[in-house]
Each structure stands twice: as C-alpha cells, then as structure tokens.
C-alpha cells in the first residue's frame, strides 16, 4: 500500500494555497492518440519478429527457443561469451521453466536479500547476470524488470554480460502498454519499489557520436524468447 500519500498531497495543496481537488478531475481526452495505434493488432509472433529486428539495431543477441530447450540456450550463450561465473535472480520462474538444476551449479549464485551486500559483491565479479523480463517492449527492444525480494537490480547491471529470459506472454507493442500495466499495479497498491527499462547493452556516445559500449553496464546482452509453460 502507498503510505503517507494523503499527508503529502495535503501539504502540497496547502503550499499552493488551495484545498485538494479529489472530485471532478477528468483524464484529458486527446483528439489524436497515435501511441495506441502502433502495432495495436500485432500478434505475439509478429511482436517477436519486431523484437528480433530491433535487437539488431541495439546490438543485442537474440534467440528464440521452446521451453524444453531453454537450459541448452543458456549454456550456449554463456559459452559464446566465454563466461565462467553466473549470478541470477532468486525467481520462481527459473523452476517453472525447468531450470532448477541450473541454479544448483557451483558456478551459479543467487541474489539473496538477507545479505544484499554480499550479493552485490558477487554481481560485481560475475561474468553473466540472468533475469526474467516482466514486460517486454517489442518496438524498442526493451525488457522491464520489477525489483522485489530476490530480484536485485545489480544482477542486470554489474556483470560483464547480461541475459534476459523473455516469456513470450510478456511481449507488448511498446511503452504505451507497459505504462498501462504499471498504472494498474499502482491503483492496486502493488507498484514495485524499482522498475528498470533496459534496451540492450550499455551504450554511450560523446559529442562526436563515437559509440562506447559497456561504460554504464554490461558489454553484451542476449534476449532469449521462450514459449510459456
């Protein structure tokens, strides 16, 4: 639940010299709303194609597999990056997708909220961070991560490489649909403490437009789209 909202808004209204408006406030009805038209009728398969094409533009590796092939796809990606150590979210979806044995490997660490300092240190030295995507924006090639217990931000930020597992059901057209879902969570009092939008590996460019990869995050990223269980 959202705490202290009423007292905060009362204070703002008081500083504005007027009472709070709690009734009669209507959302604007804009004459033109192109954000709702882009890819509005696209199927999940069509959104996968859009995402795959966008991954080329954002320098992100892309794979699509059935759920039974997911562990093999992870192993192939880890080998492709020459990685040895992994840190992953402590997320029930790993077990739902048959990756329970993967998590028990000596080379794999799980985020532990009971000792977040140690988890951050493990993320700093890990070669690969692996998370699931909660919402996936096909148009921009963006994975959305909701932080919560077991799902630390450092897992996708600090390792040299990043792998996002994308259940096909999480695909939406663009930010429009993601914002709608987040607004719904807000209304239900279930807004995550932190929401991260990640579009491929870390990219920076100076005034001369020289692309530098990996300054603010992973050097490489891979999206693995998987059919839902």
UniProtKB/Swiss-Prot annotation:
It comes from the Bacteria. GO terms for biological process: lactate metabolic process. SUPFAM superfamilies: NagB/RpiA/CoA transferase-like. Pfam families: LUD_dom. InterPro entries: FTHF_cligase-like_sf (IPR024185), LUD_dom (IPR003741), LutC (IPR022823), NagB/RpiA_transferase-like (IPR037171). Belongs to the LutC/YkgG family. Is involved in L-lactate degradation and allows cells to grow with lactate as the sole carbon source. This is Lactate utilization protein C.
């Amino acid at each position: 639940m959202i705490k202290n909202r009423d007292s905060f808004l009362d204070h703002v209204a008081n500083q504005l010299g007027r009472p709070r408006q709690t009734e009669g406030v209507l959302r604007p009805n804009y004459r033109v709303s192109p954000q709702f038209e882009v890819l509005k009728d696209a199927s999940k398969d069509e959104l996968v194609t859009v995402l795959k094409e966008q991954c080329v533009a954002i320098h992100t590796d892309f794979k699509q597999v059935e759920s039974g092939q997911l562990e093999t796809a992870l192993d192939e990606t880890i080998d492709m990056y020459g990685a040895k150590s992994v840190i992953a979210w402590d997320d029930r979806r790993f077990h739902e997708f048959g990756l329970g044995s993967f998590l028990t490997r000596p080379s794999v660490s799980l985020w532990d909220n009971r000792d977040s300092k140690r988890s951050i240190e493990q993320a700093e030295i890990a070669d690969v961070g692996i998370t699931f995507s909660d919402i996936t924006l096909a148009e921009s090639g963006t994975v959305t991560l909701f932080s919560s217990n077991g799902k630390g931000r450092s897992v996708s930020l600090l390792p040299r490489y990043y792998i996002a597992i994308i259940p096909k059901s999480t695909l939406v057209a663009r930010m429009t649909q993601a914002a709608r879902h987040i607004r719904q969570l807000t209304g239900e009092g279930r807004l995550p403490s932190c929401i991260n939008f990640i579009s491929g590996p870390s990219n920076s460019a100076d005034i001369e437009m020289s692309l530098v990869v990996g300054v603010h995050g992973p050097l490489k990223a891979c999206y693995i789209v998987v059919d839902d269980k």
